[in-house]
Structure formats: C-alpha cells, structure tokens
C-alpha cells in the first residue's frame, strides 16, 4: 500500500506547524515546551480521520528533512498506539516508497530496537510541560495492523463527512 503523507514538521524542529484543512495554509501552532525535537519528518495521511478528530499522523523516516507542505509517497512499516487529551492518537511509522536504501525496512521488527525506543520516548514526552496536554500508551504494532488502521481511518472519514 502506497499513500501520500503531507509533511507539516521537518525533522529536528521544535516548531509545531499544522495545515489548516479549510484554507490549506500552514500555521505555526506552537513551539514545543520541552527541548525535544521531532526525530523525523512528521505529517498526516490525506483523506483519513483518526479517533482524535484529525487526519492520521505519520512519522516518515527520511535521511534529510523536507519542508512543511511537501508531499511524500510512503509505505507504512508499523504504528505506535497512543492516546492524547483528545482521544486515540496513533502514529504511523513510514518510509519513502521509492527509497531503495530503506527497502530492508518492511515491518516494525526491521527497525533497530533502540531507534524505536528513541521515537517512542519522543512521543511520550513531547507534550510535557504544556498545560492541559497529555499522552499515554506507547506500544508498537506491525505493518499489517498499521495498514488496517489506515483503512479504518479512510472509512471513518467517509462515514462522518468530516
């Protein structure tokens, strides 16, 4: 399964950009309150709706940061199940579909354990220090379950018309 991810936040940034889905403009939502930085490019899968009312989030393992608004054709290799103050807030872990250097990454078990721990740690603490923000959960699931969540998120969007 190949799908497009719209990048909102480049790797290494503390700025939390969000695409305004009504206007298409990219807005600076806030700067992370902690000193942590996004480990990889972060964005969302077009035409999906996750349980928190936003499009399904995706972290894209690229060797260099892109820029807000960049479209990357991706394939999913796993997903981090999480919940935040708004509800289910799962994070897809993806690679660029055409990057042969990432061809060996087909499933979550292909990613080094330490790298998964770093990513999970980021998502467990990146909202710390922010008033009225929280994050819980943090368990990895395989590519098959991640693909199923993409399909559920597409169906959810069609049902709600959101």
State each model region's role:
Residues 1-162:
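Hydrophobic N-terminal alpha-helices or hydrophobic patches in metabolic proteins across all domains
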């Amino acid at each position: 399964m190949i799908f497009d991810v719209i990048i909102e936040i480049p790797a290494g940034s503390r700025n939390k950009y969000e695409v305004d889905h009504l206007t298409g403009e990219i807005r600076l939502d806030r700067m992370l309150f902690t000193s942590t930085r996004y480990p990889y490019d972060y964005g969302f899968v077009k035409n999906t709706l996750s349980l928190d009312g936003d499009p399904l989030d995706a972290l894209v393992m690229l060797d260099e940061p892109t820029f807000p608004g960049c479209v990357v054709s991706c394939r999913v290799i796993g997903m981090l199940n999480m919940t935040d103050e708004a509800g289910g807030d799962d994070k897809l872990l993806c690679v660029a579909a055409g990057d042969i250097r990432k061809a060996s990454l087909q499933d979550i078990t292909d990613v080094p354990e330490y790298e998964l721990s770093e990513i999970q740690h980021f998502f467990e603490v990146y909202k710390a220090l922010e008033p009225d923000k929280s994050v819980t959960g943090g368990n990895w699931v395989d590519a098959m379950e991640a693909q199923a969540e993409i399909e559920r998120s597409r169906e959810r969007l069609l049902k709600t018309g959101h």
